[in-house]
Amino acid sequence: MNRIILILLFFIIKVNSQEIAINKDSNNLTLDGNVEFADKNLIEAEKFYRKSISKDSLNIKASYNLANSFYRSELKQEAINQYKSSIEKTKSKETRHKSFHNLGNIYMQNEDYQNAVNSFKNALLNNPTDDETRYNYALAK
């Protein structure tokens, strides 16, 4: 009986340590992407973010940052899709707010005012104190 418990304990520890290693690799790739993004090497940043997401599909920072990279590269449809993905993955009100806010900005640039209004409204639901989002919401209306 003790032997079975030890085997199960060993198995749980092994699986947990592998998961930690994967998360660490994914986070390191995200950090590398952030460096490239800051240096305006958007293609390289995109590569690192994609690698990070491939290691950990629930890495919300990499998903959100990939959307920002697309947005900065003016790949609007890709940015829209990636922001929507980061919204679906996260429970963080801050990330949801920023994603919806940026979606609203893209829709405004595309003159899609109805989607812009909806995006800014959702951003305000996640952060009602943001004056910039409130201003953009009024402008889109």
Predicted segments with their positions:
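Short, charge-rich amphipathic alpha-helical segments embedded
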Residues: K47-L75, N127-D130
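Feature detects intrinsically disordered, low-complexity acidic/polar segments
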Residues: F70-K141
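Bacterial Sec-dependent N-terminal signal peptides
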Residues: M1-L31
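Structural signature of alpha-solenoid helical repeat scaffolds
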Residues: I20-A21, S54, K91, L125
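Residue signature of alpha-solenoid helical repeat architecture, marking inter-repeat boundaries
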Residues: N23-K24, S57, E94, Y135
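Alpha-helical segment of the N-proximal tetratricopeptide repeat
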Residues: I22-K51, K55
